[in-house]
Amino acid sequence: MSVYTERVAELVQREVARILQREYADRLQPMVTITRARVTGDLSIAYLYASVMGDTAEEREATFRQLESLADEIRNQLASRIRHKVREIPELKFFHDESLEEAKRMENLFDRIREERERRLEDGEDSADARE
């Protein structure tokens, strides 16, 4: 990716995040966070990775369907904000970024391992005390 393409990706990420926060926060429930963006070399498509803080998979899927249906509207708002900074306004494609959920899953796994280790140490001490 060229430096220009990277800059456009950063600009698109920042501006789409602002648009979602300011213009769509009331319509997009649960909260949506744009975690990263990637733009094709010809600037025709921006791949936006989003994390959705929903309680259920159904909520998250519904939010992504809503994002997809709003993509053209969001692109028009993006165009009005960045038209003077870029040659072409990319088409927006939203994808689910599972990295935050994966990090949370790993953290929970480490917590369970730590708890199991502590329990085994306590059980080991208890059985050592019983032998004395």
From Swiss-Prot:
It holds the Pfam family RBFA. GO terms for biological process: maturation of SSU-rRNA. InterPro entries: KH_dom-like_a/b, RbfA, RbfA_dom_sf. Keywords: Cytoplasm, Ribosome biogenesis. Its main location: cytoplasm. The keyword Glycosyltransferase does not apply. SUPFAM superfamilies: Ribosome-binding factor A, RbfA. One of its GO terms (cellular component) is cytosol. It is found in: Cytoplasm. GO terms for molecular function: ribosomal small subunit binding. Belongs to the RbfA family. One of several proteins that assist in the late maturation steps of the functional core of the 30S ribosomal subunit. Associates with free 30S ribosomal subunits (but not with 30S subunits that are part of 70S ribosomes or polysomes). Required for efficient processing of 16S rRNA. May interact with the 5'-terminal helix region of 16S rRNA. Monomer. Binds 30S ribosomal subunits, but not 50S ribosomal subunits or 70S ribosomes. This is Ribosome-binding factor A. It comes from Salinibacter ruber (strain DSM 13855 / M31).
